[in-house]
Amino acid sequence: MAQTLLNDTFLRALLREPTDYTPIWLMRQAGRYLPEYNATRARAGSFLGLAKQPDYATEVTLQPLERFPLDAAILFSDILTIPDAMGLGLDFAAGEGPKFAHPVRTEADVAKLAVPDIGATLGYVTDAVREIRRALTDGEGRQRVPLIGFSGSPWTLACYMVEGGGSDDFRTVKSMAYARPDLMHRILDINAQAVAAYLNAQIEAGAQAVMIFDTWGGALADGAYQRFSLDYVRRVLAQLKREHDGARVPAIAFTKGGGLWLEELAATGVDAVGLDWTVNLGRARERVAGRVALQGNLDPTILFAPPEAIRAEARAVLDSYGNHPGHVFNLGHGISQFTPPEHVAELVDEVHRHSRAIRSGAGS
């Protein structure tokens, strides 16, 4: 049965086509701020139990869509699935975040790295993509909203792989980058091949847009960012499938702290650039001059403010971008686990309401 996408506003915005309103989805929209997510996670037994079982991943992917009229779903998974598939031994210790049992720190460690067989090691992710697409679609083939697939960037994955987990200063991975750039580039080359293969597998399974999360690109100095992060994002994009089943598959790239390099990111071949909250959205639109769509960029902590303040800040973001195509509303980073769900409802409602008013010329 041919499928019909009932709400394609998000995809049209990414392609800079006119829309009746500004679409919104939120980074980490399926997460710990939702009581129903915590209940499902308890049933799954752990975060990895949740992410590695397609039924659970599907359930939590859909949970925010049941609460809020969001314009896209994003696959529930984790950016560290690729290094886990490489055999580095991923674990999430309570209160400590991700840890790898076998960090990559020596020439011998690097020599062991290889691009994983996506089907053999990450089939649970592509199974989840297919299952989510089915769950988003009714018996008459009508799909509610598009599904986003994603991966960490080659550099961001390398940060966790070399550090062995999270870090405050990334001194281990940066030391390798400066002392042994040959090793770092070997890691990044393998990661770029793996990320491209992983995203292409998600696209083939049914992801209708993909996003590259370069969470730690902003930790690099100018110059180092281009060598160790941006160049490898560009390599991933060059290998991506950009059409599937006759439809364009837009790609989004997001470097947290990357406002300095907006023009360079926009020139990588992406359809859209994600922005954090430190960037003025209106000026960003002028800087990219319509070459790409922009996604962002409300400070996530604003969601702790009173409802009217949330609505006012949402209007400010929308007003900054103005009545132009090519904007997807999002937060400047992932939603906090402590965010009141009712405040998210206020945000989504105001983004839809005010952007419709802007389109109609009614302003605020």
Curated annotation (Swiss-Prot):
InterPro entries: UROD/MetE-like_sf, Uroporphyrinogen_deCO2ase_HemE, Uroporphyrinogen_deCOase. It comes from the Bacteria. Pathway: Porphyrin-containing compound metabolism; protoporphyrin-IX biosynthesis; coproporphyrinogen-III from 5-aminolevulinate: step 4/4. It catalyses: uroporphyrinogen III + 4 H(+) = coproporphyrinogen III + 4 CO2. SUPFAM superfamilies: UROD/MetE-like. The record marks 78 as: Transition state stabilizer. It is an enzyme of class 4 (lyase). One of its GO terms (molecular function) is uroporphyrinogen decarboxylase activity. The keyword Cytoplasm applies. Its main location: cytoplasm. GO terms for cellular component: cytosol. Keywords: Cytoplasm, Decarboxylase, Lyase, Porphyrin biosynthesis. Substrate binds at residues 28-32, 78, 160, 215, 333. Its EC number is 4.1.1.37. It is found in: Cytoplasm. GO terms for biological process: protoporphyrinogen IX biosynthetic process from glutamate. Catalyzes the decarboxylation of four acetate groups of uroporphyrinogen-III to yield coproporphyrinogen-III. Belongs to the uroporphyrinogen decarboxylase family. NCBIfam families: hemE (TIGR01464). HAMAP family: URO_D (MF_00218). Homodimer. PANTHER family: METHYLTETRAHYDROFOLATE:HOMOCYSTEINE METHYLTRANSFERASE RELATED (PTHR21091), UROPORPHYRINOGEN DECARBOXYLASE (PTHR21091:SF169). This is Uroporphyrinogen decarboxylase. It comes from Burkholderia pseudomallei (strain 1106a).
